[in-house]
């Protein structure tokens, strides 16, 4: 699935603490491999690289929903490498968590804030990225502020190549 609106919309959500900076920057697409696309932009603190994918399947009884995305970000100036983030396309239920399943044994729990879900810390991100490299599909289950359960399925085809690409681009 091509990510045509992600360069700008993705940045607004991914870097919500840096919204003004993100709006001022236009991300540059640097590579694409199967389901994943890599981007970079110059932030106030230096170069930022991220990779993104949209779900190949969405399930849930919702009437209106924005576009969900899975993202992995490197911010070398902040010593952040492989930060995993999911954008739901809706506001999560307050205090809820998101379950990410990769393969038969890889289940991860992420905390939510607004329309985004994050790992609790960098070691958790590293474990999740490692599982994403090994897997071929990833399922993300969340609950909206209205109580609607959603299940998004992502292809992990091209994930490893794009992770290597953003790691080379943002060391």
Where are these regions (language model features)?
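Intrinsic disorder/low-complexity segments
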Residues: 8-11, 23
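Intrinsic disorder/low-complexity segments enriched in polar/small residues
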Residues: 3, 21-22
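Bacterial N-terminal signal peptides that target proteins for export
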Residues: 1-8
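C-terminal segment of classical bacterial N-terminal signal peptides
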Residues: 13-21
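A generic "folded-domain core" signal
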Residues: 22-171
């Amino acid at each position: 699935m091509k990510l045509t609106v992600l360069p700008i919309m993705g940045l607004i959500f991914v870097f919500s603490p840096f919204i003004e900076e993100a709006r001022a920057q236009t991300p540059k697409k640097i590579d694409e491999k199967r389901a994943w696309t890599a981007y970079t932009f110059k932030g106030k603190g230096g170069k930022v690289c991220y990779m993104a994918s949209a779900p190949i399947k969405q399930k849930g009884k919702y009437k209106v929903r924005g576009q969900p995305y899975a993202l992995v970000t490197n911010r070398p100036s902040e010593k952040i490498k492989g930060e995993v983030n999911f954008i739901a396309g809706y506001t999560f239920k307050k205090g809820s968590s998101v379950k990410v399943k990769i393969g038969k044994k890889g289940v991860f729990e992420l905390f939510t804030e607004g329309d985004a879900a994050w790992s609790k810390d960098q070691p958790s991100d590293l474990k999740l990225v490692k599982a994403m490299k090994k897997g071929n599909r990833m399922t993300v289950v969340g609950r909206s502020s209205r109580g609607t359960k959603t299940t998004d399925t992502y292809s992990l085809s091209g994930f490893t190549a794009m992770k290597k690409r953003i790691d080379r681009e943002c060391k």
